[in-house]
Amino acid sequence: GVTLRTVSIAAAVRQHFQDIGHDEKVTDVTYENAQARERTQVLMDIANQQNGIVVGTGDLSELALGWATYNGDHMSMYGVNGSIPKTLVRYLVRHAADTCGDEALAAVLYDILDTPVSPELLPAEEDGTIAQKTEDLVGPYELHDFFLYHFIRYGCPPRKILHLAELAFAGRYDRAAILKWLRTFFRRFFQQQFKRSCLPDGPKVGSVTL
């Protein structure tokens, strides 16, 4: 089983903001990344206490886009999801919900699927909903996973990937939207390579990995 433990990072992060002279009302990248790194520090230290390891949760899609805080959620002792794209994660969660035979567990899993993907490093909206939605910022993961597969598995150039995506997603995304997120994909893929150059080990599950 799993033991649930909540450790507040609020006091530690606020103290850190004071130490470096950062106004906590300024919700910029420093505000976000300080929280992500504090989370990781807590996990690493508890792992030391328990003589255990920190299991990373970052997936292949996040690694491709560099959508992780360097030395924050980017780091662990073992990255179990490192070769699993986010679209597959969703399929696996839905399959577990559909077949688990436990109504309470299934309800939780379906709720997870209905919740927008988010690192939740910014304050919530006034109505309590998530303000920071990853796919609003970097684009739909189903597109990025499509781009990644054809780029890494087959070495397709951007022009061919654009053509294939137009065929595969006809009626769902127009050419302008696909081109916008394709440019985002390639820009981030190469720009964020430095994060992939120092990743923890992880298993290779499918035919595409980084």
Give residue spans per PLM region.
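ATP/NTP-dependent adenylation/nucleotidyl-transfer catalytic domains that generate, transfer
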Residues: 1-210
